[in-house]
Amino acid sequence: MPNKDVSLEREKKIIDWLNHCTPQAEAIYLVGDVFDFWFEYQRSVPKGFVRFLGTLANITDQGIPIYLFPGNHDLWVSDYLVKECGVTLIREAHEFMVEGKRFYVHHGDGLGPGDFSYKILKKIFTARSARFLFQWIHPNLGIALAHKLSKKSRLAQNPKEDHYLGNQKEHLSQFVSQHLASVSPPGEKPDFYIFGHRHLVLDVQLDTARYINLGEWLYGSQYAVFDGESLQLLQWPSQQPAKSQNQQSIGK
């Protein structure tokens, strides 16, 4: 679990970004792994996010919708953020029409071919019985255990997956290609696929669509902006174009 000062610095960074976006935003989309771990006990939630949660509530109070797609780290997000912060929770892939462009949005976990072990684990952990059983573990133990497992998961990540593997090996690239081929008529094909699970900054042209991966905020800080005409991937706080790790220059 990161130390308190580092966690607070990261929290302030994303709050600054949210406050920067709010005056111009018609909607804000958070595509998962916002929390390293989250579980809502009947009478308690994980501490340490007061400023962030207050910022979310302030934004939705202004009438700006915030859509949250839970990721594999925060898949147990439930109705606390909905009731207390006004966030709209979306668990499955969802399509949005914005200024005539179609956006396909999802965290990205479990999509595409392969990765069967994770898909099985996801079914287990998203089952109501798993949540019911976990709630009987005291929060002090349960949350500490979850953070330890999360850290172990990051350390065990295959170093070969720290860079773009190419369209034929990337699960999400394969998913986008397969999904595009399955959509009919052509006018209903998404223009953009927005994901976050890969934790790499990617901007990949696949047939008629762009596959965008938003990177991460643990070490980097990238985000996408759509102004009604074009989509840019930017770096925070510089607001300069981000560089995708599939060797394409993006944000132009």
Question: Where do the PLM segments sit?
Answer:
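Short polar catalytic/cofactor-binding loops
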Residues: M1-N3, S238
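Active-site neighborhood of phospho(di)ester-bond hydrolases with catalytic His/Asp-centered motifs
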Residues: I28-G32, P65-N72, H106, F192-H197, ...
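Short, well-ordered, mixed-charge alpha-helical segments that flank or form enzyme active sites
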Residues: L75-D79, V105-H106, G112-D115
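Active-site-proximal loop/helix segment associated with metal-binding centers of metalloenzymes
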Residues: G108-Q174
